[in-house]
Amino acid sequence: TPDGVVASDSDELEGRFPAGDANLCTSSLYYDALLSASMLGRELHKPAAQTAAYRREAAALREAIERHFGARVEGFDTYRYYEGNDRLRAWICIPLTVGIDTRSEETVRALFSPALWTENGLLTQSGDKTFWDRATLYALRGAYACGETGKTTDYRSFYPARRLLG
């Protein structure tokens, strides 16, 4: 897009919730893919210029993600899922899973807040009733990745008892 994020007309929720013309998840996953391509290229002895280009593109995308998606949403300095989005979404955890930790503290607070967290895990979107186990697991992974081990372990301990064992 002109803003430097990845354009996409859908996301992993396949139209069940709004995703805009560019969404946080797709851009974050592409960022991670660029870093992975750079590392793989080095392992495969690809030209240094090629792997450096992937790293530069990833760095530019990381900055674009912050500019385009970084926002105050429902009182948290976290990410909006797409331009114009004003509700917390579970997938604000995805940047954390790929090493984008600029807004990690507030994002973790938002994920574990009553706006998103329920007895069944994370709501897909605040104010809705839909929850998705995959989003909950990614949120736990992202929170662990940014060092929020104590709080995350407390929330993780509920998961097997509630969702796996009933």
Across the structure, where does each feature detected by a protein language model lie?
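Active-site core of glycosidic bond-cleaving carbohydrate-active enzymes
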Residues: 19-46, 52, 56-59, 70-166
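Acidic/His metal-coordination segments adjacent to aromatic residues that form catalytic metal sites
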Residues: 7-23
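Short amphipathic coiled-coil heptad-repeat segments
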Residues: 64-69
